[in-house]
Design a protein with these regions (language model features):
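Cysteine-centered motifs
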Residues: 14, 18, 26, 33, ...
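Boundary at the C-terminal end of the N-terminal hydrophobic targeting segment
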Residues: 71-75
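An acidic, Gly/Ser/Thr/Pro-rich helix-cap/linker signature
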Residues: 76-166, 172-175
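Short, functionally critical alpha-helical segments immediately adjacent to catalytic or ligand/cofactor-binding
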Residues: 116-127, 181-196, 236-239, 294-295
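Secretory-pathway/luminal and periplasmic proteins that interact with or process carbohydrate-rich
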Residues: 125-132, 193-203, 214-219, 242-248, ...
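Substrate-binding/active-site groove segments that recognize
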Residues: 205-217, 258-273, 294
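Acidic, glycine-anchored loop motifs typical of Ca2+
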Residues: 274-283
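C-terminal soluble interaction/assembly domains
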Residues: 316-409
Length: 409
């Protein structure tokens, strides 16, 4: 047996290692690609007879050359995967629907129709947006454990600690003003935008105009959702019209949510506050305004100061009536006593809870579901995003960051 080892040249952090064995008139070729973000291993056996030294030398040289070329090719492939997402748009063109849309928005929002027409004439249709609006296939089971791991992870926790430390005064002032705990505000901004790092790159005008005119008709709530985005487009244009420069080149998520807290235009209009007192509301670049606005949002939806968001859930299987407990979904509908009558085993704190409670079920793929007992405040958190998975991720992220802050003192 004889062997040779080659390392190709690097290309974009990609290195291919080739190891050649000659055994039993067979050449065994091992290729390992180790870019910084992955490791791929290939092994190929080539039944080839090479008896002379010059032929072996030529073969090894050919392998080395192939490795060098493959390195570049593989690196290019990996680089392609990591390119930023390209947003493709096309013109709407002159259409009667745009004129009617401008007329409706002008009437609803009391802004000049000529100005609205001009703004909509600059809007472009976002390609592929309709697919993003469709609900996930039913074949994709929900998984709380996987969802939780996306948000409760070291980098986001570290960023949350820095955000808390940097904006300690504003966070505590928001808590004192609105009664909403610091950790909840920090949790929301962390889940929504990774503390301002991911605020979206779609032009909000393009997104909302596209969805107002081309919401996918096969969506189960197509009519309702299309009306919602038409309304949001109106709020957005009114918001822009009120600004001194009337800038419409604001970017956000593929649904039109904007800024540090990812407010939709209607939420910006109703709940955004000038929390730093500089005379203007800015959720795009001013985290202090975002802090006050998130707290104001929760207060407006009925946050009750001092009330927990949830309690642990345990069951008395002998008398458990789970179907009845789950029927109202996450809407608090049962007193503590009623829950216990239906088979819940509540902690002493939960037993003394004055308001209604809900049994919240979170699926874990093929594994057993997780459960918590949600309070009215848990339900309030779901008004920010109508998902119990989202609400619990926000709550847990904030709690972990609060613990890190406490331990650092």
């Amino acid at each position: 047996m004889s062997g040779a080892h080659f390392v190709s040249s690097t290309f974009r952090m990609c290195v291919i290692t080739c190891f050649v064995h000659m055994r039993d008139e067979c050449i065994e070729l091992s290729l390992t690609c180790k870019p910084s973000f992955s490791s791929i291993f290939y092994r190929v056996k080539l039944p080839i007879l090479i008896t002379s030294f010059p032929m072996r030398f030529l073969f090894f040289f050919a392998v080395f050359f192939a490795c060098t070329c493959s390195s570049a090719a593989l690196a290019a492939v990996h680089g392609k995967k990591h390119k930023p997402h390209q947003i493709r748009t096309t013109p709407f063109g002159p259409r009667a629907e745009l004129a009617q849309l401008a007329s409706d928005i002008s009437q609803d929002q009391q802004i000049p129709v000529a100005w609205v027409r001009h703004q909509l004439s600059n809007a472009r249709r976002v390609q592929g947006l309709e697919k993003l609006m469709m609900p996930p296939p039913t074949s994709s089971p929900k998984n709380w454990t996987a969802y939780q791991a996306r948000f409760i992870e070291p980098r986001r926790i570290e960023a949350g600690v820095k955000f808390w430390q940097t904006h300690k005064e504003a966070l505590e002032r928001a808590q004192n003003t609105y009664g909403v705990p610091v950790e909840l505000i920090v949790g929301v901004i962390g889940v929504e935008t990774f503390y301002g790092q991911h605020m979206g790159k779609y032009k909000v005008l393009d997104v909302l105009t596209t969805l107002a005119l081309h919401f996918p008709p096969e969506h189960p709530r197509a009519q309702e959702r299309q009306a919602f985005f038409k309304s949001e487009l109106g709020y957005f244009l009114k918001m822009v019209h009120a600004q001194p420069k009337g800038q419409v080149a604001i970017t956000g998520s593929y649904a039109g949510a904007m800024g540090w807290p990812q407010f939709m235009p209607s939420s910006w209009t109703r709940f955004a506050v000038d929390f730093d007192g500089d005379g203007r509301i800015d959720l795009l670049k001013n985290p202090v305004d975002a802090i006050g606005s998130v707290a104001n949002y929760f207060k407006a939806f009925g946050w009750q100061t001092g009330m927990p968001t949830h309690y642990p859930a345990q069951f008395d299987e002998a008398k458990l009536d789970k179907s009845t407990l789950l029927a109202p979904d996450i809407l608090p509908s049962f007193s503590a006593a009623s829950m216990q009558d239906k088979g819940m085993v509540l902690t002493s704190d939960a037993q003394q809870h004055k308001g209604n409670l809900a049994l919240v079920e979170l699926f874990n793929g093929s594994d057993s579901p997780s459960y918590v007992v949600g309070t009215e405040n848990f339900y309030v958190v779901t008004r920010y995003n109508w998902s119990s998975y989202y609400a619990l991720a926000v709550i847990e992220l904030g709690a972990v960051i609060a613990s890190e802050i406490k331990n650092a003192r």
